[in-house]
Every structure is written in C-alpha cells, then in structure tokens.
Amino acid sequence: MNNINDLRLNNNISNTNKSQNSTGIGDEFAKMLKNEINDLNKAQESGEAAMTDIATGQVKDLHQAAIAITKAESSMKFMLEVRNKAISAYKEITRTQI
C-alpha cells in the first residue's frame, strides 16, 4: 500500500514539473519573439532612413543604403511567414477534437 502512495506522490511531482517546464518554454518563446520583432523594427527604421536619404540626395553610400532596404524587406517577409505559420498552427489546433 505504501508503494501506491509513493507512485501517486511521484506522479504529482512530475505533473508539477511538466507545468513549470511548459511555462518556462512559453516565456522563452515570448522573449525570442519579442527580440525578433525589435530586430525587425530596427531593420525597418534603417531601411526607411536609407530611403529618405536616397530621396533627399543625402545618401553617402548607395550600396549600403540598398543593403539596408533589402534587409528590411527580407526581414518583413520572414516575419510575415512566421505569422502565417503561427496562424495556421493555431487553426489546426482549434480544429483538433479532444
């Protein structure tokens, strides 16, 4: 009988650890996503500044300006794909019957 109580206790402990690990993973994902969004924002600002410099004739290095614009465009496309995949995964999860 004592072994059964030990098993129940171990099961409760493992369930507690699983929920704590899931929360930790969610927090890590949220931090990673926030960092990527901040990087995207910086790339967009850099691209906009480069376009403004080109439009006003104040550009010092056209090649670097073109790289900044291309980087901003690529970053935005990548983030849109991540968003689309996240939405697709969410829809698939909501369709799953339990």
Swiss-Prot record:
Keywords: Bacterial flagellum
Subcellular location: Bacterial flagellum basal body
InterPro entries, per the entry: FliE (IPR001624)
Gene Ontology terms for molecular function: cytoskeletal motor activity; structural molecule activity
Chain residue ranges for the region called Disordered: 1-24
An example Gene Ontology CC term for this record: bacterial-type flagellum basal body
Skewed-composition ranges (Low complexity): 1-23
Domain of life: Bacteria
GO process annotations (BP): bacterial-type flagellum-dependent cell motility
Family per similarity comment: Belongs to the FliE family.
Protein name (Swiss-Prot/TrEMBL): Flagellar hook-basal body complex protein FliE
Organism of origin: Campylobacter jejuni subsp. jejuni serotype O:2 (strain ATCC 700819 / NCTC 11168)
